[in-house]
Each structure stands twice: as C-alpha cells, then as structure tokens.
C-alpha cells in the first residue's frame, strides 16, 4: 500500500519547492515542456514567486514531501478557456494516480471558473499522453 497523497494549492511562499521540482522536470524530460532548463534555472526568486501568484499551481505531497506539480492557467489562445501546463510527477511516484488526481482537481478549478474548455499540449511520444487520454482529453492536432 502506498502512502496517501495530499494535493494543495501552492502559494508564492512555496517557490523554492516549486522551483526544485520544475527544474528537475526540465532536466529529466527536456522535450516535454514549452521551456528549457537553461531558460528557467537562472531566473530570480521573484520570477518564481510571480509564477505561483498568477497561476493555480498544485503541489502533490507524500509524507510532507513534494513529489509532483501541475498548473492551471488562463488559456493564452482562447478566451474563456483554461490550460493545464507543467504537469509532472517524480518518476518513483508514477503509477499511483497522482497525475490523474491533479488533472481532476485542475478540471474542477476550470469548471469553477466557468471555463468552456480545458486545453493542454503534449507531444505524441510523451508517456504522459496516456494519462491525459484516460482523463478524457482528445487530440485535436493543434
């Protein structure tokens, strides 16, 4: 039996934990995100705080240790839509339903914001694609 997972919304005070997980995700999965380790690692503390202040970012924790992140933002391309970005779970904690739980929680956030759609981007070769498909997302080719 696995330890229970707790999801909570990150605050700007969580920037160090968020930064560590975000940089690790960019290091271990450089093709999975719309940014790079080189672009984000030199950013100042205030930049990281600002990201958390202007988004709905979740921290997934097991025994008080952050093991995953997922962010909901206003869709940059479509008014009234929300977008899931930067979803990532530490490799040793995958397969426990953490990503699915974050997706479901972010979907509730989007519905509460009266979003008419939830979008995300994932490459064809990304193993996370299966998680999104099981959560009901469909490829649009965009």
Regions found by a protein language model. Name each.
Residues 99, 103, 123-128:
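Short glycine/proline-centered loop/turn elements that form peptide/ligand docking sites
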Residues 96:
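Flexible nucleotide-binding loop
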Residues 12-92, 103-105, 109, 113:
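Acetyl-CoA-dependent GNAT
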Residues 4-7:
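Extreme N-terminal starter segment of soluble prokaryotic enzymes
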Residues 133-142:
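Conserved acetyl-CoA-binding loop of GNAT-fold acetyltransferases
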Residues 110-123:
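Conserved GNAT acetyl-CoA-binding A-motif
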């Amino acid at each position: 039996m696995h330890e229970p997972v707790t999801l909570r919304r990150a605050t700007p005070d969580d920037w160090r934990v968020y930064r560590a997980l975000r940089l690790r995700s960019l290091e271990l999965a450089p093709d999975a995100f719309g940014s790079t380790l080189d672009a984000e690692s030199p950013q100042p503390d205030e930049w990281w705080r600002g990201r958390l202040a202007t988004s709905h970012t979740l921290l997934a924790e097991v025994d008080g240790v952050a093991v995953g992140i997922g962010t909901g933002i206003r869709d940059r391309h479509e008014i009234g839509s929300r977008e899931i970005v930067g979803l990532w779970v530490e490799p040793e904690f995958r397969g426990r339903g953490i990503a699915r739980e974050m997706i479901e929680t972010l979907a509730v956030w989007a519905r509460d914001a009266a979003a008419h759609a939830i979008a995300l981007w994932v490459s064809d070769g990304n193993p996370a694609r299966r998680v999104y498909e099981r959560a009901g997302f469909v490829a649009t080719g965009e």
